[in-house]
A protein has these predicted regions:
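Compact, glycine/acidic-enriched structural inserts
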Residues: 25-108
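Long, solvent-exposed, polar/charged low-complexity segments
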Residues: 82-175
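Intrinsically disordered, low-complexity regulatory segments enriched in Ser/Thr/Pro
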Residues: 6-58, 130-152
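Surface-exposed peri-terminal alpha-helical interaction modules
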Residues: 1-5, 13, 107
Length: 175
């Protein structure tokens, strides 16, 4: 879903946008930062120091966690590296990283099972997004597995997805 600042442009992949993913096992709600964003947008999002990036991710993750707490949804970050034989070809996926950003921070409420700390996942995202040599897409948001999220069968899921997207605002308007 294109955002206001992308209105009137021929290609929504020049700007961050809202994404809903419908999968066999889950529904995703993400803010997507596509490979095609301008260098000025990319630098405002990623060309900050690693601590500032981690702080932005922490704030967004805390807001997502609060917004989905009673749904059994899961905060997620995803990075995908793709290549295309031609502009209109189906992409070949070279790499995918999808993880719960709460693994990077010790300050979130306890979960069952307990989230194990692995801040290196976030370090890897920062490293690849600031030293990219390929077609990379970044996403932050939440996923809702069908088997654990009964809210998916109710209209309330629309409000939950809205809360996820609003929580991700620092990755849409980083200033």
């Amino acid at each position: 879903i294109s955002l206001k600042r992308a209105r009137g442009t021929a290609n929504h992949t020049k700007y961050p946008h809202l994404t809903i993913g419908l999968h066999a096992d889950r529904i995703d709600a993400y803010v997507t930062v596509p490979n095609g964003v301008s260098s000025s947008i990319r630098s405002r999002l990623f060309a900050i120091d690693a601590n500032m990036f981690a702080d932005r991710v922490h704030r967004v993750t805390a807001a997502i966690d609060k917004g989905i707490r009673r749904t059994n949804g899961l905060p997620r970050i995803g990075v995908i590296q793709r290549r295309y034989r031609t502009q209109r070809a189906v992409p070949t996926v070279d790499a995918t990283l999808r993880f719960d950003p709460r693994t990077a921070f010790p300050s979130f409420p306890p979960t069952t099972p307990q989230i194990k700390q692995q801040p290196q996942w976030l370090d890897a995202v920062y490293s690849v997004m600031t030293s990219r040599n390929s077609n990379l897409q970044f996403q932050i948001g939440a996923e809702f597995p069908y088997h654990t999220c009964p809210i998916l069968r109710t209209p309330k899921i629309v409000d939950v997805i809205e809360r996820v997207w609003l929580a991700c605002a620092p990755f849409v308007n980083p200033d």
